[in-house]
Each structure stands twice: as C-alpha cells, then as structure tokens.
Amino acid sequence: YLNYIKNIADNGGNYIRIWLSEYGIGLLDTNGRAVDSDYNSTDAAYLDAVFRYAEERGVYIQLVPLFHGMFSSVGADTAWVSCSFNAVNKYGYLQTPTEFWVNERAKSEIKNYFRYIVARYGYSNSLLSVELCNEILSSEGITETVADEWCREISDYIREIDDNRNLITVSSASSQTDLIYSDCFDYINIHRYSDSLERFFSDINTGNDCNKPLLISEAGYSYSEPVVNTAVVHTQNWAAYMGGSVGGAMSWYWPEIEALTDQNGANPIYRDMRYLTDFSRKIGKTGLPRTTITQSNLYDYDTKSNAVGFCCGANAYLWLYDKDAINGNSDIHIKSDIMVSMPDGDYQIVVYDTYTGNKLSANEKTAANGWISFSVNNWSKDVVIEI
C-alpha cells in the first residue's frame, strides 16, 4: 500500500480505496471477537503507517471495513468460513451469513468495530470516507430492505460518535438499485465494469439527478478477467472525470497495473495519469463548481465520436473521444464539427492531446445567439478542449 500511495502521489493522484479483509489489512481475526482487545494489532499498526504516509503525500483513503464475501458461503469471493461471526469459529455464534444483518448481538458488536475504526483513524485528514460494506447486496440472502435498515442504523451510529464528520457511503455491484442513492449516504459510490463508456455516463447522469457528489470507486473493462492496458484505464479515467464524477475511475486491477512497464521501463498507466491530474488541478484551482453540459446543449456531428463535458465559471471543457478508443482502436478523424451552448462573446478554442498533455491547436471563435461552433481536425483516440 505504501508503494501504491507513492506512485499515485508522484503522478498527481490523491485518493485510493482500501478494503479491510483477510486479503490485505484485516482487523477482524477468524478466532477473535469484535472487541478492542481482539482486533489484529499488527494490521492495525500497519494501517496507522498507511494513514501517516497518506497524510504526508496528500492522498485520501476510502476505507472499506466490511465486504460481501465475509457474509457469503458460496461464490468466488466467499470468506464466510474465516469470518469471526461464523459459529464454526472460536467465538462465532451465527449459523448462516444472512443472520449477520438482523442479529442484535452482531449489530452491537459491529458497531463496536466501527467505533474502534472511528476512534483510531477518524482523526486523519486522509480519511476520505467510510464505505460501510463493499457490494453489500452481493452478500448471501440479503434483501435491499434489510440492507437499507442496517445501513441506516450503522450510519446513524457513526454520525453520533464521529466528531470529525467523516463521509459515509456504501457500494453495490449494480448501479440499478435504490440503496446506493439513499439519503443516509453522503455521496454516491458506483461500481462499473464495461466496454461501453456510455454506461459510465448513464450511471453518472442517474447520480447527478440525486444532487449528490458521485465517485466511480471500482471500474474495469470486465469483472471476470483483468483486461488492463493504457487504452482501457485512460478512457475510463477521462470518461469518469469529464462525464461528471468527482474524480477518475478507480481501477479494480491495480496489482496488474502496478506490474506494467513500457520499453523504457516506466509504468505507462502512472505516466498517463499525470496528464489528467494536471488538467483537473488547473480547473480545481478556480474554486468554481462544475456544471455538466447536457446533451441538448452539445452536438458532435461526427458519427464515430462523441463529446461530453462541463462548464466552470465562464469556461467550458469538453472531452472528445472515438467511440472505439476503449478497445484500443481509433480512426483518424479528419474533421469533427462541434457546437456547444455558450454565452455570446469571443472565445479561444484550445485542443490538448490527453496522452501527452501537448497543445494541438488554438483558434479564436465567436459565440452568437447562444451557440459556438468549431471544428477539431486530424485527431485520434481522444482530445480535451478548453473554451
């Protein structure tokens, strides 16, 4: 984790997501209890070090204390056999995973677990949020009603004890559920695996209708295999940020990303991240809110490409992309005609290469009758446009 934080921060990134589980850092031991004296002190101390280093590097952590596999006895992610609440283990008392969400003793003990997390890590400026449970609705036998009741009870408890008012969220494997949009959460947490960028935009638009911040905190080309390359991560990151998420899309396949090198021995994903983080910081420095440009106010007349973007102050920012770029394919677009709604006046249209950060062109244009029209010539893959 320290190496991940270093590489992310060195290239301008500022947030990560960490599960507390048997796969990495875990506070709940199989043969322990959900009480202060039984939490894994070695892993807790390591997490202390992770938070200290994150604070030094300006990186924020979305902390996930529970995950669905802990409460599933079947499936690829099952971890019920090692769950401390399982009756087969030393202090366990639940016969089935489904009981966890409604058993009063289990709820009392898990509140103690969250109290411990708040007490030990809630002070940190690097704690972005507490995600109550990863993909909670993938837990065995749980219903959305039960999940909603449990989340409300636990989030209410955390808010009672957390003087630092850390953000609270939850995640689901599907964005087509009311739970993740619940008013008991501070922001919307989306997981999206797809070879279609349009699904990213659909998720974001649904979230924006709730008038809450939205973060794509788990993403990939496929949930069943690690399809990891620059084209996939690049397009999903830019699609998330330019489409209206508060940041880029957080790839699930970070170990595979970490292992990538180019012919010069550098990591192409980290290098590519730099151009998006530089661009986003430029906008962030304005201190002004972003307003998504709706499709009724933006037209791309090139049938093989699409554009999304937002306004910030008097400026607009568009991401123009080839519809097949996520698959590593792209035509050379000789001329793409764009029209976007803007207040009347004179503007400079600046086009940047998102893979290098280089300025490709700059032209003066005038908006009249509430619209500005311009062309982007001889481009491929994707470009970002500043108006």
Give residue ranges: language-model regions.
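Short strand-edge motifs at loop-to-beta-strand transitions and within beta-strands
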Residues: 370-372
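Residue-level signal for short, function-critical loop segments
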Residues: 67, 136, 220, 322-324
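Active-site flanking residues adjacent to catalytic metal/cofactor-binding acidic residues
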Residues: 134, 217, 385
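Short, surface-exposed tryptophan/glycine-enriched loops
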Residues: 121, 375-379
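Catalytic-core region of carbohydrate-active enzymes that cleave or remodel glycosidic bonds
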Residues: 53, 59, 182-258
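Residue-level structural signal for beta-strand termini and adjacent loop
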Residues: 133, 364-365
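Aromatic- and carboxylate-lined catalytic core of secreted/periplasmic carbohydrate-active enzymes
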Residues: 222-224, 233-363, 378-387
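Active-site mouth of glycoside hydrolases
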Residues: 1-186, 190-199, 210
